[in-house]
Regions:
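Metallocofactor- and cofactor-centric catalytic cores in central/energy metabolism, strongly enriched
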Residues: 1-151, 155-299, 303-387
Length: 387
């Protein structure tokens, strides 16, 4: 099976062709919003971080910024910084260049002479990139070039019974095609980590699965918290989920039945053609999705029982529900109804084939519901308050 995408100079393949206006910190975010509004074909996001962070949090921010610029769906990037933030322009550019050789321009507001001059400069850079990007034509590539991210949010009992297993079926099909599938949300492995660990391809991966889960539990204990006090969420419980273990058993279904070949830290570059891998992300949907997109995911497949509009600035998000009432109520937001699996009118295998074909169409340019509505939620994981 093949799809039509955009070949990048670093060898990877995009399914979208965007110019990214990248804010290096919160102090540049409003400026990038104004810039992007003036250049059709560009995208940006509201970066609430980039300054006054402890080292581990700053690394998260740097990895996401570099990963976004390197994501195959991006033609080129205009980085905009204020000039005095911790995420200095030279550090951001260096991090990006370690991942990709795609077009890159930089604007520092303080050095440009203020906001208006910085906007004028960045708009000219972005306009030139958009014009260059428009000349590219889609080419045919095997599905092995795809990296999909898998996510679940607003879960209810149908998530573990239908939509998550359906994503798992897609994951196995992508792996069979030679592609890569990312399983995320470490906090929702808790209580089911032993099942995942049994599927580890190597002893090192086995140990890493336990390590990332135990690290989350210990971090919460250090501040006097218990993960089960906030997970399942009130919405999960209202939907019918009873406990964290039930939620976790549903969550790991998104990984299908393939061996787990690697465990990646948050936002780190994921290698293509690696089969099933795990990324150590929070359970929070926008920040988990951001980590996978920073890792190189071109498409995200998202299961929801209660319904959610979540999207992403760079990657199309395919939304799936196993709850037929949610599908009827939020059809404007949901791409796939997986409830026939529960009612026995369709099999997991047949719906899996349909979802693979939809994923192929999205890779070729078909817009998802989140894309057509303009949803671009974005958050970056953190472990500590500002300093």
């Amino acid at each position: 099976m093949n799809f039509y995408g955009y070949k990048r100079p670093d060898g990877r393949v995009g399914v979208r062709n965007k110019v990214l206006i990248l804010p290096a910190s919160v102090c540049a975010s409003d400026t990038t919003r104004i810039i992007s509004q003036q250049v059709v074909g560009s995208v940006t996001f509201n970066n609430q971080l980039g300054c006054s962070q402890v080292a581990s949090d700053q690394q998260f921010t740097m990895d996401v910024m570099a990963g976004y610029a390197a994501n195959p769906n991006v033609y080129g990037t205009v980085v905009v910084s204020l000039g005095c933030e911790n995420c200095q322009m030279d550090l951001v550019v260096e991090a990006i260049r370690e991942r990709t050789n795609k077009p890159l321009k930089q604007v520092i507001i303080q050095e440009a002479g203020g906001t208006l001059k910085a906007i004028d400069m960045a708009v000219r850079y972005a306009k030139e990139m958009v014009e260059e990007a428009s000349l590219l034509q889609r080419e045919e590539f095997p599905m092995s070039e795809l990296i999909i991210g898998t996510e679940c949010g607003g879960s209810d009992p149908t998530s573990g019974l239908a939509s998550n297993p359906l994503i798992g079926q897609l994951s196995d099909l992508i792996v069979k095609e030679g592609g890569t599938s990312i399983l995320s949300e470490t906090t929702e492995f808790i209580g089911a980590e032993h099942i995942l660990a049994r599927r580890a391809a190597t002893p090192e991966v086995h140990d890493r699965i336990y390590e990332i889960v135990h690290r989350y539990e210990k971090a919460l204990q250090l501040v006097g918290e218990e993960v089960r006090e906030g997970n399942p969420s009130p919405g999960n419980k209202a939907g019918g989920l009873t406990c964290l273990e039930e939620k976790s058993l549903g969550c790991i279904h998104k990984g299908g039945h393939s061996p787990v070949n690697a465990v990646y830290d948050y936002g780190k570059q994921v290698e293509a053609k690696q089969g099933l891998v795990i990324m150590d992300t929070p359970g929070n949907d926008p920040s988990s999705v951001a980590g996978m997109v920073a890792g190189g995911a071109q498409i995200v497949v998202f299961s929801t029982g209660r319904g959610t509009p979540t999207g992403n600035p760079l990657a199309p998000v395919i939304k799936i529900t196993g709850n037929k009432l949610t599908y009827a109520n939020m059809v404007d937001n949901i791409d796939v109804d997986a409830s026939p699996i529960i009612y026995g009118t369709k099999t997991l295998e047949s719906l899996g084939d349909e979802l693979l074909k939809l994923t192929q169409k999205v890779a070729c340019g078909k817009q998802t519901k989140a894309e057509s509505l303009g949803y671009t939620e974005m958050a970056i994981a953190r472990v500590c308050n500002f300093v």
